[in-house]
Amino acid sequence: MTKQLLLSFLALSIGISQTVIGQEIDSTALKQLEFIKKVTYGMGHDLFKTRALPYKIKEDYVAPWEKLSNSNMENLAMGLDTIISNGSIAVEKGHFEEINVVFSSKVEGIENLDDIFTIALVAYTLFDVNKNPIRLKENARTNFGSISNSGIKNGQAFSYNYRTIKSAFEIESNKDTLGISGTVKLQASFPSGYDKVVITPKDIGKQFTIGLKKYEVLNVFNNIIILKPDSKNENLDRDFDIVNLNAKGDEIAQIAYFDLLKMNEGKEKPIEMIGVGTQTISEKIYKIFTENPTISKEEFDVIIDPIAKKIFSAEDIRAEREKQFGQTYIAITNAGPVENCYLYLEKRELKRAFEKEF
């Protein structure tokens, strides 16, 4: 009788899984196991090792919630109504000869429009001249511009400064757009606020909620933050964005690759580029590297191999894997030392759905 072995006991830490058929682990499976151990060790070693941190300070940084504070909610709500009433829809050819359904509009008095306005395709029913259905790509390419003028008309001074919006949805089927007919339903929105939390090196043990998910700050060291998700969280998806600020509110940002190359010129030991973002790490792997950040690959294998044997010999592979490797944590890697790391989540409660007809 064959038995499926899920070669994924490390999936909690690196997201790799492999199915192996048979009672015994064959040579191919062993090679895959060695590869998984190598990748997992490399990930843990890279996360916990002491290193120089190449980063830059962006003094002109303005946080998203500060940009939003420049426009009050009443003004934004009126702006949405204006965008919809001024809006029109047409078929246009793009820069790369693609054919697009384009929503165009204009509005005055909205600061940071480029940063805060979004538009989404809700639904559509479109046909060509022969009544064949037309399909659209769902993601819009939105460009912003401006139109301004001033002068005197009929003895009265006038002045206007419009921001323009052009959102293009590419037609991906039936490029014959002559006689296109139908309706497009869109949703335009502005953020209504931000759910945010700040994490500093002093916040180990801090519990917080962002969006609908709860976390605990398990550790903060160098440029790393380790979060322990609440077991009741729906999933491990990272819903929040991240920015690390110094005491002045400047961004501690990732250095550009070519700037790093210039920085490393003439150095015997070049500074490594650091990947900024989040990754998952299992409780067991975290514990191994916390207790011994400089553990060698050989020492790592001595710990992992007996665990692998227990998992492969268990009746319930998945349950044993979870038992051996424990909960999954989230590791946040910043470009520079953690000072004031903001996790923030945009709220888009200010939105309007509307239809345009061909």
What are these regions (language model features)?
Residues 1-27:
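Bacterial Sec-dependent N-terminal signal peptides
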Residues 23-358:
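Alpha-helical, hydrophobic structural elements that either
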